[in-house]
Amino acid sequence: MDVSGKKIVLFGGTSGIGLAAARQLAALGGEVIAISRDPGKAGDPGPGITLKQGDVRDREALQALFKELAPFDVLISAATGGDRAIGPFLSMDMDGFKGSFDKLWGYANVVRYGTEYLADNGCIVLVSGTPARKTRPGQIAIGSVGGAVEAFARGVAPELAPRRINVVSPGLIDTPMVGLKGDERTGFYGKATANNLIPRAGTADEVAQGIVFAVQNEFITGTTIDVDGGLLLS
């Protein structure tokens, strides 16, 4: 797909991976609407990007937003969906575990209510993460959610055809979601990625390149694109 002149609706597009994708798609000539619960945190997102407020978990408001923005060519969700439970499952608060699945419900809402207004040759891109297929201790919640997102995309792809749907799966990425600073931040990423085939954290721009590829390549659907520095193989 030639992105130039296409309308792109991007949830979670005001920080981190989502904002990086918004900027790259806008640089290619796309008309990007970047949506999040707090669009102000994007600051000045740059040319070609319009900011809007929205919550993928609010189905009624989401349907109204899609009607307002329709029609569009590309639908992307990099929204986290809320809090993520971390730690051993057998001592985990089950409300926290359940809340982690807000990401899945949000993605399902985006696909369910957005497809109606998506161009016949349009595409959808979702974001999961390597814990979906390589779950480390303490990652049972995010691993389960990511696995469900990838299975959801594979399962719904035949219904969406000829529209496409794909998932981009990041490894450990240096984004604002990690609240550490200075030497503590550097040490965390260094230790966490020491055994990667590419021994460093990825960048939001590198993951965004995977999202752009999923948009542009018209011969892929129902699959997952890994941008993880070889983490799955380490």
Question: What spans do the regions from the language model cover?
Answer:
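N-terminal Rossmann NAD(P)H-binding glycine-rich loop of SDR-like oxidoreductase domains
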Residues: 14, 21-23
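Rossmann-fold cofactor-recognition segment
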Residues: 46-60
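Conserved Rossmann-fold cofactor-binding substructure of NAD(P)-dependent oxidoreductases
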Residues: 57-71
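Conserved mid-core segment of classical short-chain dehydrogenase/reductases
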Residues: 77-96, 179
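Catalytic loop of short-chain dehydrogenase/reductase
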Residues: 88-110, 117, 123-161, 172-173
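Conserved Rossmann-fold SDR core element
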Residues: 150, 159-174, 220-227
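A glycine/serine/threonine-rich, flexible loop-to-helix segment
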Residues: 173-195, 234
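C-terminal substrate-recognition "lid" of short-chain dehydrogenase/reductases
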Residues: 203-227, 232
